[in-house]
Amino acid sequence: MKKNLLLLFLMVLPFFVSSCSDEDGDWDPMKWKTEVKKSSDDYFHVPPQGGNYVFYCTNYSSFWVVSATEKIARGEEKRFSPNYDDNKDASITTDWLTAKSEGNILTVTIQPTTQDANRFMKVEVEAGDVFDEFNFKQRGLKVGL
C-alpha cells in the first residue's frame, strides 16, 4: 500500500511543479519603429489636412487592431470595433480614421477635418497578452496644438 501511495505521489508531483511557472504573461512590451515623433503630451500631432502614419512592430511578427476611439475636445467619446474578414488582418474604420494591421505593420490614415475644435483619436492593438495604443491629436481649423 505504501509503495502504491509513493508511486502515485511521484506520478502526480511533476504536474504540480510544471504548472507553477512564471513564464505565462511575461510578454515583452511592443516595440515600434516609425518616422513620426510622439510629442511630450503623448500624442502624435496631426495637421487639419490629415495624413498617413505607418508604424512597424520590431519584436512581434503580427498583431491585430482591437479598437479605436474618437472624441472632440469636451465631447463624448465614440468607440469602434474592428471589421474581421475571414480571419485576415483586422481593420477599423471610424468617422475620422482607418487603422489596418498587415503582419507587423500598422497603418493609420486620418481624414481631413472640417471642424474648428481639436479631435482626439486612439488606436489600440494587441499581440497575445501584450497591448499598446497610439494617441493622435488633430488640430482644429481655428485652434492651435
What function would you assign to each model-found segment?
Residues Q115-D129:
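A short beta-strand micro-motif common to beta-rich folds, especially ectodomain repeats
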Residues K33-E35, S40-F55, L97:
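Short beta-strand segments of immunoglobulin-like
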Residues L106, D129-L145:
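C-terminal edge beta-strand
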Residues V46, N118, D132-F134:
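A structural signal for beta-rich interaction modules in eukaryotic proteins
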Residues M1-N4, S18, V123:
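Positively charged n-region of N-terminal signal peptides that target proteins for export
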Residues N52-T107:
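Surface-exposed binding patches on compact interaction domains or structured appendages
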Residues L5-P14:
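Sec-dependent N-terminal signal peptides
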Residues L13-D41:
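Bacterial Sec-dependent N-terminal signal peptides
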